[in-house]
Amino acid sequence: MSNERDTSRTPTPDHAEHNAFFPSPYSLSQYTSAKTDFDGADYPTPYKGGKKVLMIGTDERYILMQNGSMFSTGNHPVEMLLPMYHLDKAGFEFDVATLSGNPVKLEMWAMPGEDEAVKSIYAKYLPKLKAPQKLADLLEQAVADDSPYAAVFVPGGHGVLAGIPHSREVKRLLNAFLAKDRYIITLCHGPACLLAPAVEEKPEDYPFKDYEICVFPDALDTGANLEIGYMPGPLPWLVGENLQKLGVKILNKGITGQVHRDRKLLTGDSPLASNNLGKLAAKTLLEAFAR
């Protein structure tokens, strides 16, 4: 039976930071679950060629909101770990990097505690999540013609907004991956990373102009996410709005688990797309590299 604690729409204080808040109990009851929709990862002929996927995680937990509160966030564990599970099973191992080299911050309140696939891949990569590489330190290798990476993966969670969209290192990496025909995989708020190539550039030179993507809808961040107490205040800026200003075309209106591929860019709309995006990414990379 629900109690007052489960139905409160008031964000929960995070006492590790001044005026910081986790999502409300009610919002977590609506947005999280003990298991995902994972339904298997069958890749009978996994890749054995040695190319890896570079996962860029967020190293910042707190987002300063417009009302002065801090949203205690990070990367969403399902959005990170389910795509990783599929790609790992398909034969593509991961390197993990953050902008600073500090640990990846996860929204542990969204971890599906009864999902064995998610738990197993989390355990496998936990050492790398706790001690990632600094992106700048591996950038030269990552953008080289003989790069060890088949793709870059930027998972979602509101924590992505903290630094990744403004990073010159991310800008250089994404531009190089576009130029060298490598894959970019991202979902939910992760497509905020696609703003990095616009840093210090003219809008008309934006490389993702006219690309079609799936991304978490701004309408939920300005509506339901505030109404149910998922966030303690309005975001400082909106992902979709800023991408659309640069000419990106957003396909989804809501969150249904929709995924999309446009050229070498693979995107998903929300945590609900995690399993679908993992399947799409694994299939795509196997077709491209398992030859």
Curated annotation (Swiss-Prot):
Annotated localization: Cytoplasm
InterPro entries cross-referenced by the UniProt entry: Class_I_gatase-like, DJ-1/PfpI, HchA, Prot/Nucl_acid_deglycase
Residues at the active site: 188 (nucleophile)
Q: Does the keyword Cytoplasm apply?
A: yes
Record bears the keyword Hydrolase:
yes
Q: Which residues form a coiled coil?
A: none
Q: Cite a single Pfam family from the UniProt record.
A: DJ-1_PfpI
What is the catalytic activity of this protein? N(omega)-(1-hydroxy-2-oxopropyl)-L-arginyl-[protein] + H2O = lactate + L-arginyl-[protein] + H(+); N(6)-(1-hydroxy-2-oxopropyl)-L-lysyl-[protein] + H2O = lactate + L-lysyl-[protein] + H(+); S-(1-hydroxy-2-oxopropyl)-L-cysteinyl-[protein] + H2O = lactate + L-cysteinyl-[protein] + H(+); N(omega)-(1-hydroxy-2-oxoethyl)-L-arginyl-[protein] + H2O = L-arginyl-[protein] + glycolate + H(+)
An example Gene Ontology cellular component term from the record?
A: cytoplasm
EC top class, as a word? hydrolase
GO terms classed as biological process: DNA repair; methylglyoxal catabolic process to D-lactate via S-lactoyl-glutathione; protein repair
Provide the alphabetized UniProt keywords: Cytoplasm, DNA damage, DNA repair, Hydrolase, Stress response
Entry EC number(s): 3.1.2.-, 3.5.1.-, 3.5.1.124
Annotated Basic and acidic residues bias:
1-18
Q: Which HAMAP family match?
A: Deglycase_HchA
The entry's family comment says: Belongs to the peptidase C56 family. HchA subfamily.
Role: Protein and nucleotide deglycase that catalyzes the deglycation of the Maillard adducts formed between amino groups of proteins or nucleotides and reactive carbonyl groups of glyoxals. Thus, functions as a protein deglycase that repairs methylglyoxal- and glyoxal-glycated proteins, and releases repaired proteins and lactate or glycolate, respectively. Deglycates cysteine, arginine and lysine residues in proteins, and thus reactivates these proteins by reversing glycation by glyoxals.
Stored PANTHER family = PROTEIN/NUCLEIC ACID DEGLYCASE DJ-1-RELATED, PROTEIN_NUCLEIC ACID DEGLYCASE 1
* Name listed for the protein in its UniProt record: Protein/nucleic acid deglycase HchA
Q: Which organism is it from?
A: Pseudomonas aeruginosa (strain LESB58)
Encoding gene (name): hchA
